[in-house]
């Protein structure tokens, strides 16, 4: 019988298998290395600080006050000029941010200290610095406005990320981790990490019961009625961050300063200052909010944000994560209507929310911040959560202590 000849299979030599495996591993290593390299390069961030002089400005101490009208007006002009200069330059793709940090008045001039952030995956960093400096110098030389600037006074140096964050976090109302949007805490939504870095949790024996706002290294602002149950500093602690538990950056309380005219059980002068035993170390997630000038006006219809760990509904459950809600300031006359609060709202109070209800502060939010951003996206403390009729009721918006009415009192107790 015929049988076909079966060819014998030749086995692959072990050395060839090893060589193939090593080749594949080497190729994978190269690919991963290139990915890591390009991702690292793409995310290379450079930080700078510098300054220049604005001439022909009479000496005025108000330029030193970061919250003054004069300081914000001049800073806004200079920031707009920098944005325009960089966005119209050949490095506009590398540009991230630029801010005026401080203004220092002198005889007939003001020195603007600036802070800048760029990314550049390809250029030598010294070349990038020179290009930035050149654009700034050209901006100062070609100034068509009435503002007179001194190009020769320009200075610019690269700084580390640590130093850059320290500079920005020492200024009030800035949000390095800022979100591009803030949503519409009864009817609110969860806050992002570092989105509201001045928000604090006031605790009795470790349990959250009121909110507060960080206004200085050792001072917070809250509601006086938060201390109706206890005003012994030894029982109180303050913590920060977005989670109500576990406590983050917990601090002990040294002193509670309640407004002298506050009467327990009433709503007038519902303001208190908390002094901590030690300074708070500011970082991207924890730093102070700006206090408005006593003359600053926040008109009806202005958008504001309230934050806190208060109940989702009246006598309802409380969140573990910080909540935020966008609301609007309501005209006092409207809030004093018979349908609303029937004349109980005085000049030291303000209403905020919606007359149709649903979005509001609630139990556990008391003492917390009501804030508003100015045109430079710097946030100011407008109100302190005080009282209301339950939460989110129709014609019963939240009532807040108006911070501008207590600005001088706050300064007398804190030096801020």
From Swiss-Prot:
Active site: 225, 270, 366
GO biological process, one term: proteolysis
Domain Peptidase S1: 185-415
Tissues where the protein occurs: Expressed in esophagus, cervix, tongue, and testes.
PROSITE patterns: SEA, TRYPSIN_DOM, TRYPSIN_HIS, TRYPSIN_SER
Pfam family, one: Trypsin
Topology, Extracellular side: 37-416
Glycosylation sites: 107, 235
Compartment(s): Cell membrane
Keyword set includes Plastid: no
Molecular function GO terms recorded: serine-type endopeptidase activity; serine-type peptidase activity
Signal peptide span: none
Disulphide bond pairs: 210-226, 335-351, 362-391
Catalytic class of the enzyme: hydrolase
E.C. number: 3.4.21.-
One term under GO cellular component: plasma membrane
CDD domains: Tryp_SPc
Function text: Serine protease.
Name of protein: Transmembrane protease serine 11B-like protein
Organism: Mus musculus (Mouse)
UniProt lineage: Eukaryota, Metazoa, Chordata, Craniata, Vertebrata
């Amino acid at each position: 019988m015929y049988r076909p000849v079966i060819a014998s299979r030749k086995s692959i030599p072990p050395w060839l298998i090893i060589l193939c495996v090593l080749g594949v591993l080497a190729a994978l290593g190269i690919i991963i290395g290139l990915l890591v390299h390009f991702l690292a390069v793409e995310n290379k961030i450079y930080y700078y600080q510098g300054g220049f002089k604005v001439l022909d400005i009479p000496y005025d101490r108000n330029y030193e006050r970061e919250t003054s009208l004069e300081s914000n007006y001049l800073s806004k002009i200079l920031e707009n000029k920098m944005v325009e200069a960089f966005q119209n330059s050949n490095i506009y793709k590398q540009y991230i941010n630029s801010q005026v940090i401080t203004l220092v008045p002198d005889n007939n001039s003001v020195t603007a200290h600036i802070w800048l952030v760029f990314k550049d995956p390809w250029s030598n960093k010294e070349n990038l610095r020179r290009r930035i400096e050149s654009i700034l110098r050209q901006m100062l030389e070609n100034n068509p406005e009435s503002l007179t600037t001194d190009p020769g006074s320009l200075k610019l140096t690269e700084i580390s990320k640590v130093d850059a964050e320290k500079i920005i976090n020492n200024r009030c109302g800035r949000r390095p981790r800022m979100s591009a949007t803030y949503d519409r805490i009864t009817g609110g939504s969860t806050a992002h990490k570092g989105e509201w870095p001045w928000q604090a949790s006031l605790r009795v024996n470790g349990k959250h019961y009121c909110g507060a706002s960080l206004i200085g290294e050792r001072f917070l602002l809250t509601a006086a009625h938060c201390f109706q149950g206890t005003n012994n500093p030894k029982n109180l602690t303050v913590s920060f961050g977005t989670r109500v538990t576990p406590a983050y950056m917990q601090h002990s309380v040294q002193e509670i300063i309640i407004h002298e005219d506050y009467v327990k059980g009433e709503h007038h002068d519902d303001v208190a200052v908390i002094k901590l035993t030690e300074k708070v170390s500011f970082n991207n997630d924890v730093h102070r909010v700006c206090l408005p000038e006593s003359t600053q006006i926040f008109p009806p219809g202005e958008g504001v944000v309230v934050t806190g760990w208060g109940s989702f509904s009246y006598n309802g459950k409380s969140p573990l994560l910080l909540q935020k809600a966008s609301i609007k300031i309501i005209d006092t006359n409207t809030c004093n209507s018979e349908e609303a609060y029937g004349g109980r709202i005085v000049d030291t109070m303000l209403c905020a929310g919606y007359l149709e209800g649903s979005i509001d502060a609630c139990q556990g939010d008391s003492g917390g911040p009501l804030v508003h951003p100015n045109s430079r996206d710097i946030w100011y403390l407008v109100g302190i959560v005080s009282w209301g009729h339950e939460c989110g009721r129709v014609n019963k918006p939240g009532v807040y202590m108006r911070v501008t009415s207590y600005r001088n009192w706050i300064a007398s107790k804190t030096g801020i």
